[in-house]
Regions:
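N-terminal amphipathic alpha-helix/helix-capping segment at the start of soluble metabolic enzymes
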Residues: 1-23, 93, 210-213
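Hydrophobic faces of well-ordered beta-strands that scaffold small-molecule active sites
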Residues: 3-9, 32-34, 62-64, 79-81, ...
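Active-site beta-loop-alpha junctions enriched in small/polar residues
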Residues: 8-12, 37, 67, 84, ...
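Catalytic cores of alpha/beta
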Residues: 20, 62-77, 91, 106-119, ...
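Catalytic domains of carbohydrate-active enzymes, especially glycoside hydrolases
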Residues: 22-32
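Glycine-rich, proline-tolerant flexible connector loops at the mouths of alpha/beta enzymes
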Residues: 33-43, 126-137
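Alpha-helix-loop-beta-strand connector modules within alpha/beta enzyme cores
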Residues: 45-64, 83, 88-107, 138-163, ...
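Glycine-rich phosphate-binding active-site loops on the catalytic face of alpha/beta enzymes
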Residues: 83-93, 123-136, 169-172, 176-205
Length: 213
């Protein structure tokens, strides 16, 4: 099963992206989502190749946001698709059955659609307002996530659901009680002055409080 903690990268340049991902891996994170919008394709391929080597050294999983073609070219573990990105079935045809395909969801209908499409995991949110992402979907909060999770059947819950969007340490316990499997975090880790301590605390909360699917 996947790590319960996914880091979504930040950085306005390839150098910043590399630094943030490298330091996050060094601090103990085992799952990276490379998210770098508005980057020239050659530059992004080059960066992805470098990050792939890093993740291999740290025995960590690497997926990329949106760019199915680059996931295929560089042969990384998979891709995360937003609601307006390439259809999951098309991505599956390109990448194959052995690759991870995650999908964003903001409503119960989104979640059920993602399950039916064959996503390997679902990122549900935003939990709260965040400046990390432009054109933010309506904020769900704890109540919104709880309502969605309570509607899912046991079989539907076999697809891991990750909460995303402005999550802090103090949110983890309540989030996991909804039945969510893990969390995807960006700003909390990126802006941390002590990434190792931040990730250790997150992993402690995630693995001591949650149940394994």
């Amino acid at each position: 099963m996947y790590s319960k903690l996914q880091y979504i990268s930040q950085g306005s340049t390839p150098e910043e992206q590399f630094y943030n991902i490298n330091s996050t891996l060094d601090a103990g994170c085992k799952w990276i989502q490379l998210r770098f919008k508005n980057c020239e394709k050659k530059q992004l391929i080059n960066l992805t190749e470098k990050i792939k080597k890093l993740c291999s050294l740290y025995n960590s999983t690497l997926i990329i946001n949106d760019n199915v073609d680059i996931a295929k070219i560089v042969d990384i573990h998979g891709v995360h698709l937003g609601l307006k990105d390439m259809p999951v079935r098309t991505a599956r045809e390109i990448l194959g059955e052995d690759k991870i395909i995650g999908g964003t969801a903001n409503t119960l209908i989104d979640v059920l659609t993602r399950i039916n499409e064959g996503c390997n995991y679902i990122g549900i949110g935003p939990y709260r307002f965040t400046t990390t992402k432009e054109k933010l979907s309506p904020v769900l909060g704890l109540d919104g996530i709880n309502r969605i999770m309570n509607t899912l059947t046991i079989e539907q819950r076999n697809v891991p659901v990750y909460a995303i969007g402005g999550i802090k340490h103090g949110d983890i316990d309540d989030i996991l009680k909804t039945g969510v499997y893990g969390v995807a975090i960006s700003g909390l880790i990126t802006l941390s002055n002590n990434k190792k301590e931040t990730i250790e605390i997150l992993n402690s909360l995630l693995y001591e409080t949650s149940t394994t699917i």
